[in-house]
A protein has these predicted regions:
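Beta-rich carbohydrate-recognition and catalytic domains
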Residues: 25-131, 139-195, 200-244, 249-294, ...
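Sec-dependent N-terminal signal peptides of Gram-positive bacterial secreted proteins and lipoproteins
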Residues: 12-26
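N-terminal Sec-pathway targeting helices
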Residues: 1-16
Length: 339
């Protein structure tokens, strides 16, 4: 009797174990992508390709902006997935060129977030003169935003210089609405100029790229935004046209650079160390609908997300600034680069 019960229990346990094994086997058959690999299938995020003109609202009501920088939060931040800083620039009026923040949940329809007071930088001077702000860059690190932007003036302490006095400013925000701690981090240098900065922050180290008036890209770094190393030259393989405005991002062990030249061509390149970049590829910014118009582009911002890329390209078309929004799969983006 005891032997019979043992055999019966053993049989039941065996059936249970067999069922478990079969279930696991069936699950594995679903998740492996071939008999020769144990890597699970990872479904790539679907990319809905888009090419459209969008409106970026401005505090002056003209809705013309330039020099955008976009951030994307997958799960949203303070109610929004997209946070953009840009500068109004109707009629290329530098007095309006003050960093301002707008938000969106779809990357197409932007609004000013509730409670914000744009321009977040304020105005560069009480009265309109040759002093202006420009070239904003925004990042999010741990629990707060940081904003970098440039101030330029032709006259300081009664002394005039033709190319202007240049400073790099810094501000912070916890919620993206209220901004504080406005300070100068880089003072006037007659050669460097600090145009179009890009900043990557890691473990309290600020990595900063900018362009000088000779269209040379430079790299500096700092732990505290008080002391900086001597500028290093950024090199782009087989390229001697000079960099005008640019944006650098870091993702997956690579630095990604999209930059424009003074003759309004847009390029893409990559680097492993942020100093030596590969030979750049030309991004096609010619639009059939703009044939017969007088137009040119400006500093472009981008989002690398999953297997897609999102571009925001300012165009000035017949005297008016417009924003072009383009979403592509990375495969199609790279194919266009190689054509």
């Amino acid at each position: 009797m005891v032997e019979y019960m043992v055999k019966k229990i053993s049989g039941i346990i065996g059936l249970i174990l067999l069922s478990i094994v079969m279930y696991i086997f069936m699950e594995v058959q679903v998740t492996i992508d071939s008999p020769n690999t144990d890597k699970p299938i990872i479904k790539e995020q679907e990319v809905n390709e888009v090419s459209e003109w969008i409106t970026i609202p401005t505090y002056d009501g003209a809705n013309e902006v330039t020099h955008p920088k976009i951030l994307y939060f997958k799960d949203g931040f303070n109610g929004y997935k997209y946070w953009m800083v840009a500068t109004p620039y109707e009629n290329n009026d530098t007095y309006l060129e003050n960093p301002s923040v707008v938000v969106s949940n779809d990357g197409t329809n932007f609004i000013e977030p509730k409670g914000i007071k744009n321009p977040i930088s304020g105005y560069p001077s009480i009265k309109k003169n040759d002093t202006y702000y420009s070239d904003p860059f925004i990042l999010y690190y741990k629990d707060h935003f940081e904003l970098f932007y440039r101030k330029t003036g032709s006259i300081e302490n009664g002394k005039y210089i033709s190319n202007g006095y240049n400073y790099l400013y810094h501000m912070e925000s916890i919620n993206g609405i209220k901004w504080f701690s406005k300070k100068i981090i880089l003072r006037n240098d007659s050669y460097e100029r600090y145009m179009s900065p890009s900043v990557i922050k890691t473990r309290n180290l600020y990595k900063i790229w900018y362009t000088n008036y000779d269209c040379n890209m430079k790299y500096i770094e700092s732990n505290d935004l008080k002391k900086f190393n001597k500028p290093l030259d950024v090199k782009i393989k087989n390229f001697d046209k000079g960099v005008w405005h640019s944006e650098i991002q870091y993702k997956g062990g690579k630095y990604y650079l999209i930059f424009m030249t003074r003759n309004n061509y847009l390029y893409y390149t990559e680097s492993k160390n942020g100093i030596n970049f590969d030979e750049p590829k030309l991004i096609n910014t010619n639009l059939d609908e703009l044939k017969g118009t007088y137009n040119y582009i400006y500093k472009t911002t981008f989002i690398l997300r999953g297997n897609g890329i999102e571009l925001y390209i300012p165009y000035k078309v017949n005297g008016r600034w417009k924003m072009y929004h383009k979403v592509m799969t990375l495969d199609n983006f790279y194919k266009e680069l190689n054509n």
